[in-house]
């Protein structure tokens, strides 16, 4: 068996057993670890919506419906 495969499996098992995540996996807030949750994810003038069926923010116009957003809200840059 290839030693790289063994090492990869060992690292994955260690990660799974300790509850740690690798870059790109989701944290409890729904923002991927590649995104800094202190940095507003949208362009100026838009608001950030966390869809009910997703873990990544989408950017909406402030006048858009928030019915599909968590807590029925779209967060502005000022409120981020």
From Swiss-Prot:
Molecular function GO terms recorded: toxin activity
Expression across tissues: Expressed by the venom duct.
Cysteine pairings via disulfide bonds: 42-59, 47-69, 49-74
Subcellular location: Secreted
Any one GO cellular component localisation term in the record: extracellular region
Keyword Secreted included in the entry's annotation: yes
Keyword terms: Disulfide bond, Neurotoxin, Secreted, Signal, Toxin
Prodomain positions: 24-37
Signal peptide: 1-23
Major localization class: secreted
Notes on the domains: The cysteine framework is IX (C-C-C-C-C-C).
Protein name: Conotoxin Cl9.5
Species per Swiss-Prot/TrEMBL record: Californiconus californicus
């Amino acid at each position: 068996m290839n030693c790289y495969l063994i090492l990869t499996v060992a690292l994955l098992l260690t990660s799974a057993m300790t509850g740690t995540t690798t870059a790109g996996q989701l944290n409890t807030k729904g923002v991927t670890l590649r995104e800094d949750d202190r940095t507003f994810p949208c362009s100026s003038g838009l608001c950030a919506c966390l869809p009910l069926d997703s873990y990544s923010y989408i950017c909406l116009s402030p006048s858009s419906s928030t019915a599909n957003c968590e807590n029925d809200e779209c967060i502005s840059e000022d409120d981020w």
